[in-house]
Amino acid sequence: MAFTFFHAYMPKVFEAQINAGLFRENDGIRFCQSIDIDENLKFNNLAKAGGKLYNFVKDNNCPLYIDRLQGGCFFEGYDYDMELVRTYSEMLGKKFFGFQMHEWMSNFISDTDKLVGGKCPEPWTEENITATLKRDFPFPHIFTEAMSVKEFAEVGHITELNKYLGVMEVLFLKRQKYTGEMLLPCDSAILGYSLEFKNGAKRVMPEIGQQTKHTSVQIAYARGMSKAYGKSFGTYYEPWGGEPFSACNYQKDGLNEWNISNDSFPFKTAGGNGGSSRSLQKRMYLYSYVSGAEFISEEWGLCNTFCDWNDFELTPYGQVKKDFINFTEKYKNIGKPITPVAAVIPKEIISLDNIDADGIYCSFNVDGELKRKLDIMRTGLRKLFAFGETFGNENGSLVNRLIPDAVDIVNEDVYDENKYTYAVNLTGDENFEKKYRCCSAEDVPDVLNRFLPCKVTGGLHHIVNKNSDDEYFLTIFNNTGIVRSVADGEYGLKEAEKTVQVELKDGRKLLALYGNFNMEENDSKYYITVPAGELFFGRF
């Protein structure tokens, strides 16, 4: 399947995206849906059969999905015209990606935290929930994200892990039934891929950005579980971050695709210098692509692509996006990332959360056998996804990993040894090693040096793609050294610059293709210097 970039649809802006060279033959449309969007711009009206959007999608057979059913904003409970939805599904087939189910597991926890923090009286009735949230969050709508107030009152105050996991599965199945099994899960802090694929998800989409740690873990788990189920994955980029914490909004009038403002929702935008850096945006896009993502979407793309919605001059954000789209057009055939090793985690872990946590799982205290297995899993993952020294203030999401980026993560109940050379047993079950070829987390660097077609030393994040036996691609990222703030914009620190040594096997030659770097060859070795926040992309 050709790579797809999803672009937001708004009538007054969409044609400008095409004219700017952003929309290509294989690209798709994300239909933005939230409670504050004007009714004439919501799905039942704007996407109606015979309308401009409908005809464009039909004529171009382009992918489409609805961003979003719920999550990350006030819960709406919009009454979709499901006959219209089925029309799009039948028209597009696999190119209709369905409804984004946004951060649904973590949103339930944050909703619960709001009620606990606000000392919502027990029992949690609709009246008590509404009164507590209206008092503490005096916005135009009741501030729940994971479910309606009525649904929250029905499940009540969840204080036990197993009940939480059960409620989450029931919620997912309920939304699957409503949408005709067309949910597109988008997870960040809690990755529910095991639960989601078991219950009919066709693809998953981790939300990546500066505010969520361990991007490599997010993607390695999405890739591993997608591979296990024979499905696909993409990524959803969000531009939050910086100092003070905010999101960027380059649109000079402050407009955005969600029709929200700083006084109507608990968030903060800070113009072009807000949020995380364009350096991180560039690396997030490229990393997704070389990691095997088949599509990318973005949370705040429309309000950051053009300076205004009259002249449509590209912003720095828009230029990064256009450069990336041109990159994927020029380098269409880079093959798949080489991942000979799988980190196999317990089947009980139906959602993967913070690998740095201790004694807590999905915000609940744990002990006994589950804690033992979590400790083994997290210790192993921290070794496999460890990173080196950091500079600047954009660290923790994309990092300079200490070993090659060539490890998937997969649950033990769907692990297929035919897809990997070795497994790292993080299941907590010693019998696993009697069934499968295994190596320890400590042995993985040596294993990868044997099986990868090149060796990179020097402390920078790198990943290798194989297109054929005669063509490989190497991407090297320097994921540290960027300073980003509203006051000063962004800049790179000289002390974060690093030089790596690249040794190719079988007498191959390395051809530099893209990036900001300096490369020298000496005695059949390549020395590549990459400044802070920059990257190297080459073929051999």
Give the location of each predicted region.
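Hydrophobic targeting/anchoring helices
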Residues: 76, 99-100, 109-110, 162-381
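Helical hinge/lid and interdomain linker segments adjacent to catalytic or ligand-binding clefts
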Residues: 47, 58-60, 373-444, 520-531, ...
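The substrate-binding groove and active-site-proximal loops of carbohydrate-active enzymes
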Residues: 4, 8, 30-44, 63-79, ...
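A short, well-structured beta->alpha microelement
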Residues: 6-20, 34-55, 182-194, 380-420
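Eukaryote-skewed repeat-based solenoidal scaffolds used as protein-protein interaction platforms
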Residues: 90-94, 102-193
